[in-house]
């Protein structure tokens, strides 16, 4: 669930709402049926995420979880609440020795930032995140990049001798 949230850029509510019928492992895609604003979108998955998702679906099947249950559920098919995930992530981060604040939406931010660093056009990032416009995505990325911009400015040199 955590890897999918990070590697797909989905909101935690979108991840928890996924049904097995929304996942196409052969094509490496999943469908968000009701994203923010009740919008539907298709998201691609990299091979590593697809493999992890396949492993989880195999575990579900092994435990007899009904196909009508959401992809991420209890082993009895019960739903997982967003608040559970919100409390789980900081605990997992602490046990991994991560001191920085960790929250579900930070995984979405990391996904967007990584796509930008890998050279994805802002229109592609917008579509994958399900944003209504590139301006929303740009604000999203600029807010994330503020620390980098400050660090870049701090590292600049000014050679007064050349003046």
Residue ranges and their predicted role:
Residues 35-55, 68-90:
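C-terminal catalytic core of Y-nucleophile DNA break-rejoin enzymes
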Residues 34, 129-154:
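Catalytic-site neighborhood detector that most strongly recognizes the C-terminal catalytic loop/helix
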Residues 23-25, 81, 99-101, 120-141:
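Short, polar N-cap/turn motifs at the start of nucleic acid-interacting alpha helices
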Residues 43, 86-127:
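Short, basic (Lys/Arg/His-rich) helix/loop patches that form interaction surfaces
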Residues 1, 5, 115-116:
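Short helix-to-turn junction characteristic of helix-turn-helix DNA-binding domains
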Residues 5, 16, 126:
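The alpha-helix within a helix-turn-helix
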